């Protein structure tokens, strides 16, 4: 094997090519590879963070849903208690109003009964006097017989 100028020229050209690649081609390629590795690592870390955030958000949503259900149950129970209270108050008011109306009606009936009795007594007294006048066929002196009429009215 002869070392001649061609091999020596090729070796120098190869060394220059390697030096040129190491100086100008290799750093941008390594920078691009490192940048891509960093982007991939950041993407994986971001995906992991997003997964943790999603789990946390789901847990918070579940907790809020449970709290909302509990609050709704409390509100429903309060509404049911208020409804029962309103019904009881309405029943009590209706009962009081009924009792008031019944009492007024009984008072009116009693007053009407007394008035009718008094009217009936007066009419009976007039009829008794008229009947007595016809029987006796003379006029009864009202002043003299007022005691008899008063007793008759009192008995009726």
Curated annotation (Swiss-Prot):
Q: Name one GO molecular function term.
A: proton-transporting ATP synthase activity, rotational mechanism
Membrane topology is: Single-pass membrane protein
Gene3D superfamilies tied to this protein:
6.10.250.1580
Question: Keywords for this entry?
Answer: ATP synthesis, Cell inner membrane, Cell membrane, CF(0), Hydrogen ion transport, Ion transport, Membrane, Transmembrane, Transmembrane helix, Transport
List where in the cell it is found: Cell inner membrane
Q: Which PANTHER family match?
A: ATP SYNTHASE SUBUNIT B, ATP SYNTHASE SUBUNIT B', CHLOROPLASTIC
Q: Which NCBIfam families match?
A: ATP_synt_b, PRK05759.1-2, PRK05759.1-4
**Protein name, entry field:** ATP synthase subunit b
